[in-house]
Amino acid sequence: MNNCTPNIKSSYGYEDLLASGRGELFGKEGPQLPAPTMLMMDRVNLMTENGGLFDKGYIEAELDIHPDLPFFGCHFIGDPVMPGCLGLDAMWQLVGFFLGWIGGKGKGRALGVGEVKFTGQILPTAKKVTYRIHMKRVINRKLVMGLADGEVEVDGRVIYTATDLKVGLFQDTSSF
């Protein structure tokens, strides 16, 4: 795998992310992002094949917060907060996106996480969530797998951290 795909860029806008969800960005054999309302980012500001804390790759993405986001209406009524699992899922989404960006093929699946810590919350009054992913390792064998650490920041404050985020790309998910 390498980053010599014809559509390689270092940043992606919302329309690009939607194209990924339709299988158009990295091709039909590449991993896809989910479509809205499960797509947890509005843009990817920076992707590098090197860099990050481990010099194995770095991703920075953002989600604009609006009070009318669907989860605020039901989680919880009278006490709206973005579910923490959605921030965790966003980090998995970005690891899978990185694997497609470097040329990986297959259907992306979250495989696990070492440790997650929540030290804050995302309320409808927030303005922006920033995700930072530090790739630790990419394995390219029968299974393509990415391993990374990540953090979620709201309005400049880190509120979630995750270690050993694992995402795999599968050619066949029928036995997964």
From Swiss-Prot:
One of its GO terms (cellular component) is cytoplasm. This is 3-hydroxydecanoyl-[acyl-carrier-protein] dehydratase. Keywords: Cytoplasm, Fatty acid biosynthesis, Fatty acid metabolism, Isomerase, Lipid biosynthesis, Lipid metabolism, Lyase. One of its GO terms (biological process) is unsaturated fatty acid biosynthetic process. It is found in: Cytoplasm. The gene is fabA. Homodimer. It comes from Haemophilus ducreyi (strain 35000HP / ATCC 700724). Necessary for the introduction of cis unsaturation into fatty acids. Catalyzes the dehydration of (3R)-3-hydroxydecanoyl-ACP to E-(2)-decenoyl-ACP and then its isomerization to Z-(3)-decenoyl-ACP. Can catalyze the dehydratase reaction for beta-hydroxyacyl-ACPs with saturated chain lengths up to 16:0, being most active on intermediate chain length. Its EC number is 4.2.1.59, 5.3.3.14. GO terms for molecular function: (3R)-hydroxyacyl-[acyl-carrier-protein] dehydratase activity; trans-2-decenoyl-acyl-carrier-protein isomerase activity.
